């Protein structure tokens, strides 16, 4: 693969992987798996850490927070290193993958684009 194809592949992979990873909502998943309820129908209706902690409490809420942070941090770290290696643009890789992680968090494809 030539250098230009590698760069384009890396850009597409960063966008898709960051978006899809950040679109996973652990509060929704954990509320359904562990409590057999949908957090979006309880409390404030917000499917996030604060509502999860308010409704269910416990240590599991802190796991939700940790996974919420990691779902964006891991792709940003991985792709910033890959961008550094292939294009010498570490900061661009972090910002680029971070942007798509924000989009995935706010408009997740897994939940009909409702974050």
List each language-model region with its residue ranges.
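Short, strongly hydrophobic alpha-helical membrane anchors
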Residues: 1-9
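N-terminal signal-anchor transmembrane alpha helix
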Residues: 9-35
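Nucleotide and nucleotide-moiety/phosphate-recognizing core
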Residues: 10, 14-15, 60-63, 71-110
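Short conserved micro-motifs on helix faces and helix-strand junctions that flank
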Residues: 19-20, 65, 112
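A generic alpha-helix surface/boundary motif
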Residues: 24, 45-46, 72-73
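C-terminal ends of transmembrane helices
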Residues: 27-30, 103-115
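Cytosolic, membrane-interface loops and tails of multi-pass inner-membrane proteins
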Residues: 28-61, 115
């Amino acid at each position: 693969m030539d250098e230009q194809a590698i760069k384009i592949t890396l850009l597409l992979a960063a966008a898709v992987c960051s978006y899809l990873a950040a679109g996973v909502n652990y509060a929704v998943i954990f509320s359904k798996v562990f409590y057999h309820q949908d957090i979006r129908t309880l409390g404030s209706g917000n499917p996030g850490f604060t509502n999860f902690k308010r409704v269910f409490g416990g240590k599991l809420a802190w796991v939700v927070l940790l996974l919420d942070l990691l779902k964006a941090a891991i792709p940003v770290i991985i792709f910033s290193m890959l961008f550094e290696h292939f294009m010498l643009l570490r900061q661009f890789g972090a910002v680029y993958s971070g942007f798509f992680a924000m989009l995935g968090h706010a408009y997740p494809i897994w939940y009909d684009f409702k974050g």
